[in-house]
Amino acid sequence: MHRLAFTKADTAKFISHLDLMRTFQRSFLRAGIHIKHTEGFNPHAFVSIPLPLSVGYSSSCEVLECQVLDTPLEEVPQRMNAALPAGITVQRCYEGVRPVKELYYVNYIVTLEYEAGAPFGAESAIRGLLSRDSLVMEKKSKKAKSGKVEVDLIPLIAKATVEERRDTIALDLILKAQNPGLNPELIVSAIRTYCPDAAPDYAVFHRRAVLDERFQNWE
């Protein structure tokens, strides 16, 4: 299995996961790169993204899996970048070795923005919130009859750094990636719930790295 490491930025942040898959399938065709297809009466290009990115997030560490058939891997980035839309950039193509189950953590940078500047005491309030022994929030769940389930966020947060930067507060978060994973939007929701005086006007999300259990880059 081969992997494409790519970035997603600017207007490409708003491409949904399904549309992103279709975009890559079309771009392989335009680039003249043959990849493995599914078998059957309606074969289609086999591509997958192990950790789909939420709409509106930027990322410098996305990974797409495929099987390149007859193109040297070192040629793939240049040819794909000529075919992909603006905001999506393939950095490299390589032979995947690590199984997806070893993708353990995700590093996010969440920027909390305030139109009138960060409120006094917001940084310490948020730091205190993320230092609690327990932080329970409701999240959507298809399995629950009510459509929601309570989850304690603290066991899913491996590391959290809070830093005020002029009119913003930056959260450097390392969160569980899967089984279960934690969406950083839940942390922003927790700030709005438990620290309303520190609630941002809006938040900007960036995925910076995908990591293994030892906090090393997963590839």
Per-segment meaning from a language model:
Residues 6-8, 65-71, 110-116, 173-177:
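Short beta-strand-to-loop capping motifs
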Residues 14-18, 70, 74, 120, ...:
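Ordered, soluble secondary-structure elements with a strong preference for glycine-centered loop motifs
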Residues 36-66, 97-99:
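Short, charge-patterned binding micro-sites
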Residues 60-111:
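Ordered, amphipathic secondary-structure segments that act as subunit-interaction surfaces
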Residues 74-84, 120-132, 187-188:
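Short amphipathic alpha-helices in soluble, non-transmembrane regions
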